[in-house]
C-alpha cells in the first residue's frame, strides 16, 4: 500500500499538498523570554513524506557521489566526512604552513539564515546542472515549491504562512539540497587561498610571508561577496571574524561589504576552541570547567 503510494508520487512528480506543510514549534534557548531571537524553531514534517525523502536522498546521494559531484572541501552531511575530518584537514594545513615559517590569516564567514533564504529558481537550476533530470527533477521541483507552515505555541495554532525561499527545514532532503546549492562556491576561490565548508559554515585562510599574499585573501572576500549576490545569499559582516596565527603576525584589516571584519584571539570552530597560538588551552580549560560542573550530578 505505502510502496504503491510512493511509486505513484514519483511517477507523477506530485506530492500531496498536506505533505508540504510543516509545524513550527519555537524552542526556548536562553535570555529574555519575550525576545523571539531567544527561541530556536523546530520544524515537524510529515512522517510518511520523510520515509519517501530518505529513499530518494540515498539514491540521489549515491548518484552524485558516483559522479564525483561534491567538492572535496565540503564536509557537511556526507558519508565519511564530518566535523572531525574537516578539523583534521584544516589543522594539517595550518601546522604544515607554520612549520614552514608562514603566518596564517583565517576569516570565518557567517551567512544570514542561509538555509531559509536559498532562492528556489537558482536551486532548481543547480539541481539540473548536477545532472538530475526526469522524474527525480520533477519530484524535487514539486517538493520545494508551494510549501507552507503553521506555528504552534502551547495550545495555540497560527494560520498558514507560505514559504517563498529556502530548502525545507526539518526535512530529510533539505541538507542535501543545500549542498547542491553551495557546491560551486569553493570553485570560485583562488588556488592559493584555503577554503573549508561544513554545509553553510565557511572559513577562508591564507599562509603568507608578505603583504602581497595577504591582499589575495582580501580580494577573495570580494569574490565571495559577488558569489553571494549572484546566488541570493547574504553575509552577516558583524558575525564574521578574523584570526591571526603565527609568530609576529601583524594584524591587517579585512573588509566585507565595506565593513571591517572583527578580530578575535580565540574562536569556536565546529566545537573546537582555536586560539592564535593553536595551543588548545582554552578548549582544555572549557572541558575541565564543564567536568567540574557536571561531576556533582553523577
What is the meaning of each model-derived region?
Residues 155, 219-222, 234-267:
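Short, conserved micro-motifs composed of acidic
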Residues 56-74, 99, 175-205:
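Active-site palm subdomain of RNA-directed nucleic acid polymerases
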Residues 90, 177-181, 217-220, 291-294:
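Hydrophobic alpha-helical membrane-association signature
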Amino acid at each position: 500500500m505505502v510502496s504503491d503510494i510512493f511509486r505513484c508520487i514519483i511517477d507523477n512528480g506530485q506530492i500531496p499538498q498536506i505533505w508540504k506543510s510543516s509545524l513550527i514549534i519555537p524552542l526556548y534557548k536562553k535570555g529574555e523570554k519575550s525576545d523571539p531571537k531567544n527561541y530556536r524553531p523546530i520544524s515537524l514534517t510529515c512522517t510518511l513524506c520523510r520515509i519517501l525523502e530518505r529513499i530518494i536522498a540515498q539514491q540521489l546521494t549515491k548518484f552524485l557521489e558516483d559522479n564525483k559531484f561534491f567538492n572535496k572541501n565540503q564536509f557537511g552531511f556526507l558519508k565519511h566526512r564530518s566535523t572531525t575530518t574537516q578539523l583534521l584537514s584544516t589543522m594539517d594545513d595550518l601546522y604544515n604552513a607554520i612549520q614552514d615559517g608562514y603566518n596564517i590569516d583565517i576569516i570565518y564567514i557567517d551567512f544570514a539564515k542561509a538555509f531559509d533564504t536559498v532562492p528556489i529558481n537558482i536551486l532548481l537550476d543547480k539541481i539540473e546542472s548536477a545532472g538530475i533530470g526526469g522524474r527525480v527533477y520533477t519530484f524535487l521541483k514539486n517538493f520545494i515549491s508551494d510549501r507552507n507552515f503553521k506555528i504552534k505555541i502551547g495550545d495555540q495554532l497560527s494560520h498558514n504562512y507560505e514559504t517563498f525561499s529556502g530548502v525545507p527545514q526539518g526535512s530529510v532532503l533539505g541538507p542535501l539540497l543545500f549542498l547542491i546549492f553551495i557546491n560551486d562556491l569553493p570553485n570560485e576561490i583562488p588556488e592559493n587561498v584555503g577554503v573549508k565548508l561544513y554545509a553553510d559554515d565557511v572559513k577562508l585562510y591564507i599562509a603568507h610571508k608578505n603583504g602581497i599574499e595577504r591582499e589575495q585573501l582580501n580580494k577573495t572576500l570580494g569574490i565571495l561577496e559577488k558569489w553571494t549576490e549572484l546566488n541570493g545569499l547574504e553575509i552577516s559582516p558583524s558575525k564574521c571574524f578574523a584570526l591571526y596565527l603565527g609568530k609576529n603576525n601583524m594584524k591587517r584589516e579585512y573588509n566585507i561589504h565595506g565593513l571591517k571584519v572583527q578580530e578575535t584571539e580565540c574562536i569556536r570552530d565546529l566545537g573546537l576552541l582555536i586560539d592564535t597560538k593553536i595551543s588548545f588551552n582554552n578548549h582544555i580549560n572549557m572541558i575541565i570547567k564543564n567536568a567540574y560542573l557536571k561531576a556533582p550530578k553523577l
